[in-house]
């Protein structure tokens, strides 16, 4: 599932175990519960969230085998991930994804839903695989892609050629902020970046509101109509 460690003002959320970290209802509920736990901490608005993982996968996307065995669960998983992404966007603190393995499809969307993406260069790629497996991408995935990938050419390559984007290529495309030689170096760099952000100070609530406005299209697709200045904390559980 996932674990949470607090180091001073840093919250380190880790997807644990050596599996593929498929986004099934249980894991998604665990991630949302952990985000809610962070929100309840008295220091949360002066903190930084770092999300990383064990093993060779950051996340290999939705649990497609589970969805095939029970098609109704595909709708449940999509709704739960939409709510998780909205949680991250509304979280009143900066967020960093330390991508130490493959991040595919919904797993790629999860990584890109963070403010910063740091990635190891010796293993792993960002991969929107839907074209290759002949699945139509949900409209809200496209909203995330538009909000997070500025270059039309990069969006084309990611979505319409199903490019497997390594860390160094991701830096050139503007998707990845920086690349590192190993998983350990990637996490260390994320911690260093988080500490630098904390040292700069700032009000997490103001930061979160600015992020909500910046990613307004994503919020409209994930939680419905959104008005700048309104709070999106968090009634979306009723939609699942």
UniProtKB/Swiss-Prot annotation:
GO terms for biological process: fatty acid beta-oxidation; fatty acid catabolic process. Its main location: other. A motif (Microbody targeting signal) lies at residues 238-240. GO terms for molecular function: delta(3)-delta(2)-enoyl-CoA isomerase activity. CDD domains: crotonase-like (cd06558). It is found in: Peroxisome. One of its GO terms (cellular component) is peroxisome. It comes from the Eukaryota. Pathway: Lipid metabolism; fatty acid beta-oxidation. SUPFAM superfamilies: ClpP/crotonase. InterPro entries: ClpP/crotonase-like_dom_sf, Enoyl-CoA_hydra/iso. The record marks 130 as: Important for catalytic activity. Keywords: Fatty acid metabolism, Isomerase, Lipid metabolism, Peroxisome. It is an enzyme of class 5 (isomerase). Its EC number is 5.3.3.8. It catalyses: a (3Z)-enoyl-CoA = a 4-saturated (2E)-enoyl-CoA; a (3E)-enoyl-CoA = a 4-saturated (2E)-enoyl-CoA. Able to isomerize both 3-cis and 3-trans double bonds into the 2-trans form in a range of enoyl-CoA species. Essential for the beta oxidation of unsaturated fatty acids. Belongs to the enoyl-CoA hydratase/isomerase family. This is Enoyl-CoA delta isomerase 1, peroxisomal. It comes from Arabidopsis thaliana (Mouse-ear cress).
């Amino acid at each position: 599932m996932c674990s949470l460690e607090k180091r001073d003002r840093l919250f380190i959320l880790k997807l644990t175990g050596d599996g593929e970290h498929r986004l099934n209802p249980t894991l998604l509920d665990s991630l949302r519960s952990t985000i809610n736990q962070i929100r309840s901490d008295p220091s949360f608005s002066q903190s930084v969230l770092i999300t990383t993982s064990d093993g060779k996968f950051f996340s290999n996307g939705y649990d497609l085998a589970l969805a095939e065995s029970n098609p109704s669960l595909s709708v449940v998983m999509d709704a739960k991930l939409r709510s998780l992404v909205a949680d991250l966007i509304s979280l009143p603190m900066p967020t960093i994804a330390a991508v130490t393995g493959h991040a595919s499809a919904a797993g790629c969307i999860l990584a890109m839903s963070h403010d910063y993406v740091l990635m190891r260069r010796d293993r792993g790629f960002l991969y929107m695989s839907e074209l290759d497996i002949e699945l139509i991408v949900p409209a809200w995935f496209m909203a995330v892609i538009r909000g997070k990938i500025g270059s039309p050419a990069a969006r084309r390559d990611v979505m319409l050629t199903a490019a497997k984007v390594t860390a160094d290529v991701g830096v050139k495309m503007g998707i990845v902020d920086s690349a590192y030689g190993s998983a350990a170096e990637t996490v260390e760099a994320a911690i260093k970046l988080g500490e630098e952000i904390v040292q700069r100070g700032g009000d997490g609530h103001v930061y979160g509101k600015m992020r909500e406005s910046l990613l307004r299209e994503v919020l409209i697709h994930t939680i419905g109509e959104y008005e700048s200045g309104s709070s999106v904390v968090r009634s979306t559980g009723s939609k699942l």
